[in-house]
A protein has these predicted regions:
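Generic preference for well-ordered secondary structure
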Residues: 9, 35, 39, 74, ...
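Catalytic-loop motifs flanking and including active-site residues across diverse enzymes
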Residues: 21, 105, 179
Length: 179
């Protein structure tokens, strides 16, 4: 809910069905994959601080007992490339699209996780990185897109994204999900 955390951001800048998609994915992990609910760190409308703390918690868990364990990270929200470097960033609800580099750098997240003991790491990102959102741009850059660079994958790491670099992710209004 970007509009609740930032001035001059209207509700159209929110990511439709992001929370619903995350809840469905959490239930998928629990019911179909058998992951205990206490092993799922579920954040709604996460701020930069909350996302950073969750990443640090995950790193500590990986250091304690990650060697043979699979790690799954699911993110549904805005993504944007930094204009100069074109590096993709995850944009927490309290980060404005004009300050992309204050978000979570996808490259840094992948590097941090790949350096810890782990089995497989799956990053599932339901966000576009074209600079355009699912409804409208977070920064009001209508018609302007930036093609992000692809981050390097770590060893035994999988990255799934809802769209490629120059595509916008869309929503399925009828089924109330992001695509």
């Amino acid at each position: 809910d970007y509009a609740s955390f930032q001035r001059n951001v209207n509700k159209e800048s929110n990511v439709p069905f992001a929370i619903r998609d995350a809840e469905v994915f959490k239930n998928y992990l629990h019911k179909l994959y058998g992951m205990p609910l206490e092993n799922i760190d579920f954040l709604k409308n996460a701020t930069f601080g909350e996302m950073s703390q969750a990443i640090s918690r995950l790193e500590r868990l990986m250091e304690l007992d990650g060697a043979d364990n699979d790690i799954v990270v699911f993110y549904s929200g805005h993504g944007m490339p930094e204009e100069t470097t074109k590096e993709p960033f995850l944009i927490p609800v309290d980060i404005n699209g004009t300050n992309v580099s204050q978000g979570i750098a996808l490259k840094n997240l992948m590097k941090r996780l790949s350096e810890k003991p782990h089995g497989r790491i799956s990053l599932i990102i339901d966000a576009c990185f074209s600079g355009l959102g699912k409804n409208e741009p977070l920064v009001g850059l209508k018609g302007i897109t930036i093609k992000p660079v692809n981050p390097e994958l770590g060893n035994n790491m999988l990255l799934l994204s809802s769209s490629s670099g120059n595509e916008s992710s869309v929503v399925d209004q009828e089924n109330k999900h992001g695509l």
